[in-house]
């Protein structure tokens, strides 16, 4: 099998089979899988992702489209830097070696990529254009620098965006995240929050789950800001944001973020307050905040209620109010907010009900809508009515204003690492921040660099960061931070349109190819990569790099590949190939000791539940692996790896070869007529095409297996419909080609076809062949089913009437009389009224 696969891979390579032109009169189709990080080896998760995309690409090609199906490398990132530290090798050397290896692996799987368009994000000829783009953003005030409280990963020694912190830990290292103040570069994605939110409804070919995740991440909140005067210091105010301003008369405290500026100005920092603030520093984002026990500490500060000066509210530093949401301050209404209620119970604060409820709000918060009570001029109004009225009132009295807030924050792009795209800025003592001139791009990374695992090597480089200021020519310092690697993946799909363009994009090529028709990848990228790519596309549109404002028309998120986990008697993880199964028990191959089988989980290095793809490929071949990852589960669902399932796919491929040998030996003079087989061939063509279009690839494979069984069952018959068997087998080979391209090309050639299979059109079905010669009708008497009968297509209404009224099961109800009436539902029901 491997020889056949290598043969066809070489032919496709020699013929440049999947290279496409930007100048073509065919309709275009752009299918793209999320580009991989070049770790050195592709894994089964890659194979599943890319096999899905490959089926779509090959199918659309057979449907007559000009198909762009490119591949590239998201090559910057921490693993390369860690490998450099471990192996004393430059990250570039490690990365390019991995790229070469993985490119060969992808080719060995038979994926139909246009390798002439390959991009590598660590290539200066790629990233110089994103440096230029960053400078353009800076000129438009869409890129800026500020000191910010950031998520610091103490293992990777770098800053992480909020989206990269999962349950308080770094998404790569797993380290507990710390909070630090650092000068950082940001992109103003918040300027596009409203458009990013509004356009979600138009992404009709995206999964609802992803659209919902983006909506929640952007998190639009409409409410009001109130101005609370500080008691005994009425020149000072605390501005408070609330999404439920109508509950203002239920306020019992003001909650502020631990880093609210008023703490430094007006609040005495007692040791207790300092300790509390330190504890708050460990809460890294909204996801961890939701899980944390709500806590707070009283300050010496009090404020005056904006509508009732007799009400004095304490100011409490809390662990659940964030400075980067709203104003960093809230009014607490414990009766109608779960977080406020939890804190009020803990700190013995008043709980004042202002919405009618059928529960005791002292025991549990009532968070539903209702009628306002205990609320002065708002009494008797619904929540929405009260909300509008209170906003009008605070604006009239100038004690507040209507306000819209977003959960989405500006994107912090600074990373304190070496192996990334250098940020093209210079710091001069005379001129302050100075952009690198366009003519000096790209700013490249040095080759002579030392890695010791401590901080950013660019900070310690003896010469690289030292440069003369482009404005005054005096000594200056380069920015030593590099871009977040999501920067590279936020625009790469535009570069594929012409990867050799002499600007960021070739706009004419982008106008032809964009948007991407189908983008395929994991749902874990829903609120990072996909959101950033949408943001970049909008800005690139404004910079005249592209004409579209949304990058991906359709999105498909595939499930993960799972495998059982194993542990030895010492609780150490074991690889699957270290384990053998006997009598429904698992044993260590070497020691013979009993092994515990754990849960079936996502394949991961840490739990060793991986399979060696190269070994499997040598044993079973690429086609069998492709078929298995597509046939055993719907593509959007998780797939459990199974050697027995893989062996079944290998047997099916062997069966195809056997079927070819039988069919090749058949003589055309041995013939019969099998209308049912002919009908099944045409039905299979119809439904396989529909299944592929709907990504029901496992269902398509099941239909093709059914057709193969129907064809092979003819082999044992004395009188065989040879013509239909041969036609059906030719169709089967064509239908299977997008799934198992190597063996189908081989069989197609052996069948005597001159044209390459990948160049042929997808088979067409004949609608007239889908109909049966007969049909079954339900026979009712007075609306109740009494019998069924199979009629010929040619049967007239008169014949149907005569046959049905003479059926024995009908006759006993007629009792020798004529029916009063006969009602027909054509080809479905005949109802005899007696």
From Swiss-Prot:
Gene Ontology molecular function: aminoacyl-tRNA deacylase activity; ATP binding; leucine-tRNA ligase activity
Gene Ontology BP annotations: leucyl-tRNA aminoacylation
A single GO cellular-component term on record: cytoplasm
Presence of keyword Cell cycle: no
Alphabetized Pfam families for the sequence: Anticodon_1, tRNA-synt_1, tRNA-synt_1_2, tRNA-synt_1g
Subcellular location per the Swiss-Prot or TrEMBL entry: Cytoplasm
Uppermost EC category: ligase
Classification via Gene3D superfamilies: 2.20.28.290, 3.10.20.590, HUPs (3.40.50.620), Isoleucyl-tRNA Synthetase, Domain 1 (1.10.730.10)
Keyword Glycoprotein attributed: no
Short motif 'KMSKS' region, span: 602-606
Cystine connections: none
Keywords: Aminoacyl-tRNA synthetase, ATP-binding, Cytoplasm, Ligase, Nucleotide-binding, Protein biosynthesis
Catalytic activity as recorded in UniProt: tRNA(Leu) + L-leucine + ATP = L-leucyl-tRNA(Leu) + AMP + diphosphate
Binding site for ATP: 605
Locus of motif 'HIGH' region: 36-46
InterPro entries linked to this entry: aa-tRNA-synth_I_CS (IPR001412), aa-tRNA-synth_Ia (IPR002300), Leu-tRNA-ligase (IPR002302), Leu_tRNA-synth_edit (IPR025709), M/V/L/I-tRNA-synth_anticd-bd (IPR013155), Methionyl/Leucyl_tRNA_Synth (IPR015413), Rossmann-like_a/b/a_fold (IPR014729), tRNAsynth_Ia_anticodon-bd (IPR009080)
EC number: 6.1.1.4
Name used for this protein in its record: Leucine--tRNA ligase
Source organism per UniProt: Rickettsia canadensis (strain McKiel)
């Amino acid at each position: 099998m491997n020889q056949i696969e290598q043969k066809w891979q070489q032919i496709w390579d020699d013929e440049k089979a999947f290279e496409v032109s930007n100048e073509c009169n065919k309709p275009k189709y752009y299918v793209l899988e999320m580009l991989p990080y070049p770790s050195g080896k592709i894994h089964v998760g890659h194979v599943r992702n890319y096999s899905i995309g490959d089926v779509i690409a090959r199918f659309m090609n057979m449907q007559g489209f000009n198909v762009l199906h490119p591949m590239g490398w998201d090559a910057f990132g921490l693993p390369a830097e860690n490998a450099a530290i471990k192996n004393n090798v430059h990250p570039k050397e490690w990365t390019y070696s991995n790229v070469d290896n993985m490119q060969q692996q992808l080719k060995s799987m038979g994926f139909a990529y246009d390798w002439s368009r390959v991009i590598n994000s660590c290539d200066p000829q790629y990233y110089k254009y994103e440096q230029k783009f960053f400078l353009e953003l800076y000129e438009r005030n869409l890129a800026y620098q500020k000191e910010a409280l950031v998520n610091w990963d103490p293992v990777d020694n770098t800053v992480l965006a909020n989206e990269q912190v999962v349950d308080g830990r770094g998404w790569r290292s797993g380290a507990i995240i710390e909070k630090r103040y650092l000068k950082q570069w940001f992109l103003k994605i918040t300027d596009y929050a409203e458009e990013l939110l509004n356009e979600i409804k138009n992404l009709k070919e995206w999964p609802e789950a992803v659209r919902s995740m983006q909506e929640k991440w952007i998190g639009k909140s409409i409410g009001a800001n109130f101005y609370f005067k500080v008691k005994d210091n009425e020149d000072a105010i605390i501005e408070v944001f609330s999404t439920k301003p109508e509950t203002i008369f239920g306020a019992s405290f003001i909650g502020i973020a631990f880093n609210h500026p008023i703490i430094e100005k007006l609040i005495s920092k007692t040791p207790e307050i300092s300790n509390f603030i330190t504890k708050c520093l460990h809460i890294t984002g909204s996801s961890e905040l939701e899980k944390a026990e709500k806590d707070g500490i009283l300050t010496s500060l009090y404020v005056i209620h904006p509508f009732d000066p007799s009400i004095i509210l304490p100011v409490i530093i809390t662990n659940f109010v964030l400075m980067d949401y709203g104003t960093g301050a809230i009014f607490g209404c414990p009766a109608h907010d779960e977080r406020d209620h939890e804190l009020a119970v803990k700190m013995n604060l008043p709980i004042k009900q202002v919405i009618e409820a059928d529960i005791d709000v002292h025991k549990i918060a009532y968070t539903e809508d209702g009628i306002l009570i205990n609320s002065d001029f708002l009494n008797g109004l619904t929540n929405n009515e009260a909300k509008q009225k209170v906003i009008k009132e605070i604006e009239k009295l100038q004690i507040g204003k209507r306000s819209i807030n977003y959960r989405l924050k500006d994107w912090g792009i600074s990373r304190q690492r070496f192996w990334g795209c250098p940020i093209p800025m210079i710091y001069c003592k005379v001129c302050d921040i100075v952009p690198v001139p366009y003519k000096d791009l790209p700013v490249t990374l040095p080759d002579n660099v030392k890695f010791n695992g401590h901080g950013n090597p660019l900070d310690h480089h003896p010469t690289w960061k030292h440069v003369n200021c482009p404005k005054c020519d005096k000594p200056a310092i380069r920015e030593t931070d590099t871009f977040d690697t999501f920067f590279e993946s936020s625009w790469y799909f535009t570069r594929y349109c012409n990867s050799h363009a002499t600007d960021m994009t070739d706009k004419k090529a982008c106008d032809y190819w964009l948007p991407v028709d189908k983008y395929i990848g994991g749902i874990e990228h829903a609120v990072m990569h996909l959101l950033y790519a949408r943001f970049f596309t909008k800005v690139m549109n404004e910079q005249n790099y592209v004409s579209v404002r949304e990058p991906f028309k359709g999105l498909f998120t595939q499930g993960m590949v799972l495998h059982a986990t194993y542990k030895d008697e010492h609780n150490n993880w074991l690889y699957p190939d270290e384990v053998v199964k006997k009598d429904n028990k698992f044993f260590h191959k070497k020691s013979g000791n009993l092994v515990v089988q754990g849960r079936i989980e996502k394949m991961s290095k840490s739990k060793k539940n991986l399979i060696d793809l190269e070994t499997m490929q040598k044993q079973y071949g690429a086609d069998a692996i492709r078929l298995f990852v597509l046939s055993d589960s719907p593509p959007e669902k998780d797939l459990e790896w199974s050697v027995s399932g893989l062996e079944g796919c290998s047997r099916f491929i062997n069966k195809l070869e056997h079927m070819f040998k039988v069919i090749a030996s058949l003589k055309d003079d041995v013939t019969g007529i099998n209308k049912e087989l002919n009908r099944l061939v045409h039905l299979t063509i119809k439904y396989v095409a529909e299944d592929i279009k709907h990504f029901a690839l496992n269902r398509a494979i099941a239909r093709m297996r059914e057709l193969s069984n129907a064809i092979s069952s003819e082999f044992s018959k004395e009188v065989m419909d040879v013509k239909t068997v041969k036609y059906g087998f030719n169709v089967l080979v064509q239908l299977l080609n997008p799934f198992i391209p190597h063996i189908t090309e081989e069989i197609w050639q052996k069948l005597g076809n001159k044209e390459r299979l990948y160049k042929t059109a997808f088979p067409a079905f004949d609608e007239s062949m889908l109909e049966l010669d007969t049909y079954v009708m339900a026979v009712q008497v007075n609306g109740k089913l009494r019998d069924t009968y199979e009629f010929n297509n040619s049967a007239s209404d008169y014949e149907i009437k005569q046959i049905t009224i003479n059926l024995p099961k009908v006759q006993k109800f007629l009792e020798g009389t004529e029916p009063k009436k006969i009602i027909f539902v054509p080809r479905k029901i005949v109802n005899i009224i007696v």
